[in-house]
UniProtKB/Swiss-Prot annotation:
UniProt source species: Pseudomonas putida (strain ATCC 47054 / DSM 6125 / CFBP 8728 / NCIMB 11950 / KT2440)
This protein's encoding gene: galD
Phenotypic effect of disruption: Does not prevent growth in 5 mM gallate medium, but the mutant strain grows poorly at gallate concentrations lower than 2 mM.
Record-given protein name: 4-oxalomesaconate tautomerase
Gene Ontology MF terms in the entry: intramolecular oxidoreductase activity, transposing C=C bonds
Family to which the UniProt record says this protein belongs: Belongs to the PrpF family.
Length: 361
């Protein structure tokens, strides 16, 4: 039996990598589309040897994009996390790193026309219902990938791509502080539950018997720590309006400690069971936001300045992630960040016709 060829762009977005598809090049939403995405990535084989996934949650990601019918957006973007070692596709969250590639994809595929040295692309994030605006560098009417901006976790330099968000608070949980408190206690551990684009549970590393400066490999090998984190996560899912999270990748769990390298706060994130080599975009936004909230577990560890526009550097195992937060009379109004993206290939990805024969003609 032959193979089905699906048009695809493989792109690095921020510190992640994923397959970018036009909505109409895939089956309609449902079990068939999920089977196609699993086949594309090679899941549930833990090595993903028969697909284009990289045997890592950071490289087993998909963006599904189409022209938007909304007045306030140019394109609609649906993020799919293809679980590496399970036959499961999770649509329950955004990915701000993969988001960084959506604007360039829209221009590469002709969904948006270039306009000047920088082209704004308004992106409706279907997973959570929020709008982001990506300023894509478009020298000479084309996406400009080369530049001198460096982000931690990515070798080399590339063109800066600025992404801003007006209102992502409570995107998944319905409120910035979904439990209604800046601090809660679960199983004897003080936590802050926050959702400023990503549901995150923040904990002081020392309360879990670690420093928070350990390498990811050390934390990965600590089965007692991971068991305790998961017990806390499962209890907090319903309290964060997320329901049963046993089969979901949210909320993320994030261990905090005082900054070591001149940043605002130091982090070790779990997504949800593996220690992240850096930190997700929206995870960093939620952590940075918590640093400004009175009574949060982050506030006592964080080093912050005053003012209505604050830059907070979230330290992580690969370096730091800087988030700019805007405030008005002490109330958080918006946030922005700098990412980079790069087109890796433009072609087709092949799957067996026994999985899907392709779109009807």
């Amino acid at each position: 039996m032959g193979q089905t060829r699906i048009p695809c762009l493989l792109m690095r977005g921020g510190t992640s990598k994923g397959a970018y598809f036009l909505h109409d090049d895939l089956p309609a939403p449902g079990p068939l589309r999920d089977r196609v995405l699993l086949a594309v990535m090679g899941s549930p084989d833990a090595r993903q040897i028969d697909g284009i996934g990289g045997a890592d949650s950071l490289t087993s990601k998909v963006a599904i994009i189409r022209a938007s019918q909304r007045d306030d957006a140019d394109v609609d973007y649906l993020f799919a996390q293809v679980v590496v070692d399970e036959a499961r596709v999770d649509y329950g969250q955004n990915c701000g790193n993969i988001l960084a590639g959506v604007g360039p994809f829209a221009l590469e595929r002709g969904l948006v026309a270039a306009s000047g040295a920088s082209t704004p692309v308004r992106i409706f994030m279907e997973n959570t219902g929020q709008i982001a605006v990506a300023q894509v560098p478009t020298a000479d009417g084309q996406v400009e990938y080369a530049g001198d901006t460096r982000i931690d976790g990515v070798p080399g330099r590339a063109a800066a791509l600025v992404v801003t968000f007006a209102d992502v608070a409570g995107a998944s949980c319905g409120a910035l502080l979904p439990t209604g408190n800046s601090r809660d206690c679960v199983e004897g551990v003080e936590v802050t539950c926050i959702d400023n684009g990503m549901p995150v549970v923040l904990l002081c590393a020392e309360d879990l018997g670690v420093t928070g400066y350990e390498p990811c490999e050390t934390l990965e090998a600590d089965s007692a720590l991971k068991t305790r984190l998961e017990a806390i996560r499962l209890q907090l899912g319903p309290r964060m309006n997320l329901g049963d999270v046993s089969q979901r990748n949210v909320p993320k769990m994030c261990l905090l400690s005082a900054p070591r390298n001149g940043g605002t706060v130091n982090t070790r994130s779990f997504i949800p069971h593996r220690c992240h080599a850096s930190i997700g975009v929206f995870g960093a936004v939620s952590v940075a936001t918590a640093c400004l909230i009175e009574g949060s577990v982050a506030q006592g560890l964080a080093s912050t300045s005053g003012g209505d526009r604050q830059r907070l550097a979230v330290e992580h195992p690969s370096g730091e992630f800087t988030v700019e937060i805007s405030l008005e009379h002490g109330v958080i109004k918006g946030c922005g960040l700098v990412r980079t993206a790069r087109l890796l290939f433009d072609g087709v990805v092949c799957i067996g016709r026994d999985t899907w024969g392709g779109p009807e003609k």
